[in-house]
Regions:
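Hydrophobic ligand-binding cavity/cleft-lining segments
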Residues: 1-42
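Short, surface-exposed coil-to-beta transition loops
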Residues: 3-5, 55-59, 80-84, 95
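Generic structural detector for well-ordered beta-strands
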Residues: 7-11, 38, 48, 61, ...
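A short, structured loop/turn motif at beta-sheet edges
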Residues: 14, 42, 63-68, 86-95
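Hydrophobic pocket/interface hotspot
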Residues: 17-21, 27, 45, 62, ...
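Short, intrinsically disordered, mixed-charge
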Residues: 19-29, 118, 122, 126, ...
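Glycine-rich portal/gate segments that line the openings of hydrophobic small-molecule binding cavities
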Residues: 38-79, 127-135
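Beta-strand/loop substructures that line and gate deep hydrophobic ligand-binding cavities in soluble
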Residues: 75-126
Length: 136
């Protein structure tokens, strides 16, 4: 699996940041690439994303919810991925660290995705955190 990491500082305590990140359905408002998120119950969600000129659908399950320190998920269908937000208090507020791992099954698609995905994920991650920060 390929791994992407992104870090940012938000000027708010971890409790406030975590409260926004754990509202998974609201990620639709945090990124232009997320078309919709369907709650499936029991910590599971179906994501519909348009990225790299393709539509992607995958189901994820929240695998760890430890307020206000960590929120993690893993895909259960569709694009294989897992990720985690780690929140750490710092003098300026909260350091938010995203680690995202993914695997694309098609070699042709994987090559195109690898070229575009790292800057794309970093941009989307920053967009998400900027929009979360605006709600704090």
């Amino acid at each position: 699996m390929a791994t992407i990491e992104h870090r940012a500082i938000l000027e708010a305590p971890p409790e406030r940041v975590f409260a926004l990140l754990e509202r998974v359905e609201d990620f639709v408002d945090y990124s232009d690439l997320i078309e919709r998120i369907e709650p499936l119950g029991e910590g599971r969600y179906r994501w519909h994303v348009h990225a790299v000129r393709m539509d992607w659908t995958f189901e994820v399950e929240i695998t760890e919810r430890r307020a206000p320190e960590a929120l993690a998920w893993e895909s259960r269908s569709g694009v294989r991925n897992r990720g985690r937000y780690r929140l750490t208090p710092v003098p300026e507020g909260t350091e938010v660290a995203l680690t995202l791992e993914y695997e694309i099954q098609s070699r042709l698609v994987e090559k195109a995705v690898k070229r575009a995905v790292t800057p794309l994920v970093n941009r989307v991650s920053q967009q998400i955190l900027d929009r979360v920060a605006a709600r704090l």
